[in-house]
Amino acid sequence: MLRIAHRLDLQLRAAMDRAFPEQAAAARQASQPLDPQLAPASKPEFGDFQANGALALAKPLKQAPRQIATAIVAQLQADPAFTDLCLEPQIAGPGFINLTVRPERLAAEVSARLGDQRLGVPAVEQAAPVVVDFSSPNIAKEMHVGHLRSTIIGDSLARVLEFRGHPVLRLNHVGDWGTQFGMLITHLKQVAPDALDTADAVDLGDLVAFYREAKKRFDDDEAFQTTSREEVVKLQGGDPVSLKAWGLLCDQSRREFQKIYDRLDIRLNERGESFYNPFLPAVIDGLKDAELLVTDDGAQCVFLEGVQGKDGKPLPVIVQKSDGGFNYATTDLAAIRYRFGAAPDGDDARRVIYVTDAGQANHFAGVFQVAQRAGWIPEGARLEHVPFGLVQGEDGKKLKTRAGDTVRLRDLLDEAVERAETDLRSRLNEEERSESEEFIQHVAGTVGLAAVKYADLSQNRITNYQFSFDRMLALQGNTAPYLLYAVVRIAGIARKGGDLEVLTGQLQFSEPQEWALVRELLKFDAVIAEVEEELLPNRLCSYLFELSQVFNRFYDQVPVLKADAEALPSRLALCRLTADTLKSGLGLLGIPTLDRM
């Protein structure tokens, strides 16, 4: 109900100005206009909205809040635009003004959304380019469960921002540069030289094993260390043999990553660390020009303001090592500079969002401060870190295999689909239903992957969460199967003869369950705006779960297909809008829906 809320806010402000003209004029002069403090009602019995601004005026006006609220209400009642929108306001408690939208206006809002693909969610008036940096696996390493959160949280946020009308650049900042390639190329030259000049000579699993061997040699063998560093210098210098080997390794990993992305329906533009190599010297020059660089023990650093180590001294962000090499902070600064830079030499972004684990919070806080002090973040632009917690096993410890290894993402997704298939076959057997193998595979694949995505997204991303196949695949509770089944239930209404597409005349509602569903449906636009601002997909999940519950109560307690001729069209309209809203909301989470389960 964002449109109604905006209209009410303007009407309340005008009423306050008329009720207290002197105070309003003084407030405007101080650039602090009177605020009605309009918010959704905390409980259904309080109406639709609640205005709490009278309490804040009590001290400056030296009047009781209820007296102030009474004066504001009198002005509202004298405004025909307000009385056309709301029933008579009620003053509650110390001076809260409770507002209830007229039923016919709520019904009109539902009617408007029935013909609106955006379901009442307005596109932003001034779309600003947004960069969302997410997923970001490392070359020559398999994607593991830790990449799941960044990938699906980042994808969901990108979908919401795109839906709101922002041009979004989805970036995959893969780890495709650095010492690890010197190690790996040196090792492969000795044990599997074909992998360095022949495509697909080894698969990603082999590369991972070779990487572990190379890392052990690098840690234990000084001669191997020296050769590896020489290989890095060759790579940085553009040696054609080294570059070809590097390119083949990247391509092999890229193909494996893409299989995961295709499976999860993730769209990404790869732009690895290597992309920013040409811009690293300019970062140093820019920091020098801004007089931020300090030489400390041979390294070039920027000391942070307001951040001290255990010794009480300011912590440094090292941007160039004593040997002249660069590090992650330098690359991240180059990326920030490029992303905010004007086109065609930059992305021209006005909001840059990094979706990584919470363990990198201090790193990004330091890098962001350096970029801000260097003047690389345009005025009014936003640079944000979206941190997330760990994926834990049901024992509360970091999720591992029985052998103690990191869980491969591919294996986790396979198991989710296998378990969904087992559950489906068991249910079909209990119901004595016969379905084609194609149907079973499609439903199991959809439900399994949806369950994994939703279980993650429904948690507050800032906290750790416990991974449980049993919980996420359950048909009850705040799960993907529960929501998918709500959509299936509505599709069943159409199959049983309810035409969800035809609506003639005005909508009419009389039952409390109908009005509860109407009000829940009309919250969708506010929830999307909240996710766009707060970058918390779990708010959307909570809304969809509540909507499903409200719909199920409506459907269980109010006749739909057996309703009388007068009530039937309006109830079918509620079913249709519920299905559309669930499909749209789940789509923004990257979850497709089903007509049958």
UniProtKB/Swiss-Prot annotation:
Reaction catalyzed: tRNA(Arg) + L-arginine + ATP = L-arginyl-tRNA(Arg) + AMP + diphosphate
- Protein's UniProt keywords contain ATP-binding: yes
Does this entry carry the keyword Ribosomal protein? Answer: no
Q: Could you say which EC number(s) this protein's record lists?
A: 6.1.1.19
Ranges of biased composition (kind: Low complexity): 23-32
Location of motif 'HIGH' region in this chain is 137-147
SUPFAM superfamilies per record: Anticodon-binding domain of a subclass of class I aminoacyl-tRNA synthetases, Arginyl-tRNA synthetase (ArgRS), N-terminal 'additional' domain, Nucleotidylyl transferase
Location (main, coarse) = cytoplasm
Q: Name one GO biological process term.
A: arginyl-tRNA aminoacylation
Cell compartments where the protein resides:
Cytoplasm
Under the heading Pfam families, the entry gives: Arg_tRNA_synt_N, DALR_1, tRNA-synt_1d
Q: What enzyme category does the UniProt record give? A: ligase
Region Disordered, residue ranges:
23-43
One GO cellular-component annotation of the UniProt record comes to:
cytoplasm
NCBIfam families in the cross-refs: argS
Family assignment? Answer: Belongs to the class-I aminoacyl-tRNA synthetase family.
Q: How does it assemble?
A: Monomer.
Record protein name field? Arginine--tRNA ligase
Q: Which organism is it from?
A: Synechococcus sp. (strain WH7803)
Q: Per UniProt, what is the name of the gene that codes for the protein in this document?
A: argS
